[in-house]
Structures are given as structure tokens and as C-alpha cells.
Amino acid sequence: MKAILLVLLCTFAATNADTLCIGYHANNSTDTVDTVLEKNVTVTHSVNLLEDRHNGKLCKLGGIAPLHLGKCNIAGRLLGNPECELLLTVSSWSYIVETSKSDNGTCYPGDFINYEELREQLSSVSSFERFEIFPKTSSWPNHETNRGVTAACPYAGANSFYRNLIWLVKKENSYPKLSKSYVNNKGKEVLVLWGIHHPPTSTDQQSLYQNADAYVFVGSSKYNRKFKPEIAARPKVRGQAGRMSYYWTLIEPGDTITFEATGNLVVPRYAFAMNRGSGSGIIIWDAPVHDCNTKCQTPKGAINTSLPFQNIHPVTIGECPKYVKSTKLRMATGLRNVPSIQSRGLFGAIAGFIEGGWTGMIDGWYGYHHQNEQGSGYAADQRSTQNAIDGITNKVNSVIEKMNTQFTAVGKEFNHLEKRIENLNKKVDDGFLDIWTYNAELLVLLENERTLDFHDSNVKNLYEKVRSQLRNNAKEIGNGCFEFYHKCDDTCMESVKNGTYDYPKYSEESKLNREEIDGVKLESTRIYQILAIYSTVASSLVLLVSLGAISFWMCSNGSLQCRICI
């Protein structure tokens, strides 16, 4: 009876002791992140680094409308196809839009030499000045400038020709040698285009140019080429058996371009002084331009985001996130989200000893739960929480700043003869893309691992801070909790939390209570030992008596014979 009373006394004393627990925040978040060692770790807070949403529209870029070519393409716009006349007045744009129906290009059949390279050049041009490089009325007095029209380039039901070129033919059965130069005084690159006509027969050659053995020479400091017309019978295209070859070059500021010819020259009338801009580009999409504004445009739609990565489209124009193949890039900022009713699973408790977080602590990441005669409650440790928030915020901002080098990525142009180069280029681009995706994913995995370890370390440091103050004035009872050997009111609890706990003040009370509890435990242990001895002896006597009774019964009925020899 005495033992039972002592045990009850010990239990009663333990139940009414004041306690202080170290813990961490938990909430109802379902955000998951990946680390180097784990996948789909639920965390209290995280930030998404990957943009996967767009508006599905073509928008203005930085408030500037794009140049929508409609049924025209780049060639038609630059040569001045009569069907593209409405586009001639547009001098600036944010980017260029072609459609799958942009068929109005070279109306007179022929080849546009290095057309893909010209498109690539224009992908970095945001505006140009269209100016008359060789005035029509004064530049060619000895040649006919109005007869060079064709049914292949109709306008308003009549034969016409490109608005930016002049098809020179003979005048009064004479085509004297021409020589004309232009000096670039625009202070910027000037794009100049011209053409060479290839008649189908010698008769056509003489009818148009009089000279049977004509030539064309075009030269500048960087471009020098002599052309000879290729007279040959060809199948008709757009009603024409002849062909034209279209050429272009860029004239640097201060440079001179010279045209010399005895026939077959389609001379430039207008040229283009170009202003380059890194945010321009060419998009092929059938959508119209909407009344919206964006900083980043893709062929799938506009992106308005400050995130460093996107997985929408590799071709972008404007201030755009980097394209990666990833489907998820989420960076942890908070702790592992493990409410106390759940198990931590394979990797155990946070900080190695606390089994669950507190949903009741909402004003910080780390903190305390106390219980004493005045009540109980949660309180966040503001200093450690704020230090952690500042550190993680700076880290996230640094990662985003380093990775958020916004740029324009345009598709590269290749013609059908350069298919092998195009395929090789795609392989190289895919290789770089794979490497960039791997680097981005690895960065996030490593930073998530460091963040979660950082939180674990902060909780453990907070626990050690409390333990170093309390020393033997309290005992560790597991799961991050301390049980005081003395009464600890709210003022006492607050002193522990803010690091001003007065250990000597409570040492004597703690010593007495500790010795009393230890004495109760010792007395209880001795009584249990005596009871165990008595129980063992009694059990042995009962066993011996039982064996004797069985033996006597068996001897009496003959089942067991006993012989005593002397």
C-alpha cells in the first residue's frame, strides 16, 4: 500500500509540473518541393520559379505595336509587293508577325538570295527609315522607268511592279551603260535591295535591253559581284517564263555602293536606314493583334511574369524568362510541413527530436509552447524567425536575380539547301537547353536541401539555447520539451524565451524538488524489489506442493511406483 501511494505521489507531481516546449510552425499548405535526397516534400511556404501561363494573344510589346504582315511576308514588305502597299508607311514596330498565309512575297517568280539571313538580320531591327536612294524622275534619264511592269504583280486590275524597285528597260532602242553610286550619310546601316532579270529568250533580251551580252556589277567596300543574265526557256510561273534573282546588302555608314550595268538590272528606288533593337524578332502565328500590353511575347501568347524560368515556348521576344523543359521548379522558403498528428516517416523528426509542428503558432516559424498554473499558450521566437526570413528572402532574391537575365530568343532561319545545318543547329540548341534545364533543376534541389537543413538547425539552436539556460533546473522529457523542477510563472517563462532566465534564483527550489522526486523513485524501487522476492519464493513453494500432491496421487493408484533401497 505504501508503494502504491508513493507511485501515485510521483505521478501526481509529474503531471502538475510546469513545462516549456520548443517547436516549429505548421499549416495546411500542400506545397511540395524536391530536394537532392527526397521528392515531394510538403513545406509550409515556397515560391514558384517556373511560369507556365500565357494569355494566348499577340500584344503590344512595351506599348509598341507589332508589325503584322497579314497576307504579306518579309520579302513582299521589303520589295514593295503591290499587295503590301498598306505596310509601306509603317516605320517602327516591337516585333514582326507573319502568318501561315503570308504568301505575298516575290510576285515576279525567282529566287531571293540569302533570304533567311536577311530575315535573321531583321529580327534585331525595331524600326527603319524608308528613303529614296535613287529618285525615279532624275536618276535614269537615258533609260525607261515606267514600262517595267508585269501581269505577275497586278494592282487595281492593271500591270504593276514592286514599289521599292524600278525595272529599267531600253529607251528609244538604246540601253546605254549606266553607273550610279550612293554614299551612306545616314549614320547607320542602310539596307539596299536590287534584282537581276533573266529573260526566257534572246529575243526578249533584245526587246527589253537591246544589248545581247549585258552584265551588271554591284560593288561596295565589302560587297563586289558581277552578274550575267541567264537566258533560258523555263516553265511559266504566274504567267512568266522569265525569272528574277533578288539580292541585298548592308552599307555601313560612310561607305559607297555603286551600280554599273548594260542591261537586266532592276535598280533600287527606296532603301532602308535601320535602327537595331535587341527586343525585336519575328513570330509566325495566325492570331490577330489584341489590345493588350506585355513585356514578353511568345508564339503561344504573351507572358507577364517576374519569374526567372518559363516552359511555354523556346522562342521569345522582349524581356522574357529563360525557357527550360522542366514541369516544376519550386523553391522552399518555409519548413517541412509536418503537423504534430502526422509521422515524419523515414527521415525522422525535424531537428532530429521534435515529432510534429504546431498549427497553433501562426506568428513565426520557430517558438515555444508553455504550460503552468496561469495557463498555456504559443509564442513565436521573433528574433530567430526574422533572421531566417531575412536570410531566405535574400537567398531567393539572389537566385532569381542571377537566373533572371531576361533575353530574346528567336528562331534561326535556314533554307531547304541548308537542312543539314538546320538539323545540326537544332541538336546544338537542344543540347544547350538540356544543360540549362539540368542546371536550373539542380540549383533548386540544392537550395531546397540547404533551406530545410537551415530550418532544422535553427530549431535545434533554439532548443540548445533553452537547455543551456535551464541546466539541471529542469529535465528533458523528449519531443523538444522541458519539465521544470520549480514553479515557473509567466514572467519566468518569458525570461527563458528572451534569454534572461535567472538560474541561481530557482536553483534551491529545483534541488529540493529534484531530490524529493528522486527519493520517491528510490523508495518505490526498493519496495518493488522486496515484492518481487516474495513473489518468487511463494511461486516456488506452490510449485513444490503441487508436484508432491501429484506424485502421492500417482503412487496411490499404481501409476507411479516408488522403491526405497537401503
UniProtKB/Swiss-Prot annotation:
> Which InterPro entries does the entry mention?
Capsid_hemagglutn, Hemagglutn_HA1_a/b_dom_sf, Hemagglutn_influenz_A, Hemagglutn_influenz_A/B
Name-wise, this protein is: Hemagglutinin
- Name the Gene Ontology molecular function terms of this record: host cell surface receptor binding
Asked if the Swiss-Prot or TrEMBL record annotates the protein with the keyword Glycoprotein, the reply is: yes
List where in the cell it is found: Virion membrane; Host apical cell membrane
- Disulfide bonding pattern of the chain: 21-481, 59-292, 72-84, 107-153, 296-320, 488-492
- Lipid tethering residues (S-palmitoyl cysteine): 555, 562, 565
Q: Which organism is it from?
A: Influenza A virus (strain A/Swine/New Jersey/11/1976 H1N1)
What Gene Ontology cellular-component terms does the record carry? Answer: host cell plasma membrane; membrane; viral envelope; virion membrane
Q: Which UniProt keywords apply?
A: Clathrin- and caveolin-independent endocytosis of virus by host, Clathrin-mediated endocytosis of virus by host, Disulfide bond, Fusion of virus membrane with host endosomal membrane, Fusion of virus membrane with host membrane, Glycoprotein, Hemagglutinin, Host cell membrane, Host membrane, Host-virus interaction, Lipoprotein, Membrane, Palmitate, Signal, Transmembrane, Transmembrane helix, Viral attachment to host cell, Viral envelope protein, Viral penetration into host cytoplasm, Virion, Virus endocytosis by host, Virus entry into host cell
A Pfam entry, by short name: Hemagglutinin
Q: Is Transferase one of the keywords UniProt gives this record? A: no
Glycosylated position list: 27-28, 40, 104, 304, 498
Task: List, in alphabetical order, the GO biological process terms annotated in this UniProt record.
Answer: clathrin-dependent endocytosis of virus by host cell; fusion of virus membrane with host endosome membrane; fusion of virus membrane with host plasma membrane; viral budding from plasma membrane; virion attachment to host cell
Coarsely, its chief localization is: virion
Membrane topology is:
Single-pass type I membrane protein
Instruction: Write out the PTM section of this UniProt entry.
Output: Palmitoylated. In natural infection, inactive HA is matured into HA1 and HA2 outside the cell by one or more trypsin-like, arginine-specific endoprotease secreted by the bronchial epithelial cells. One identified protease that may be involved in this process is secreted in lungs by club cells.
Transmembrane portions of the chain: 530-550
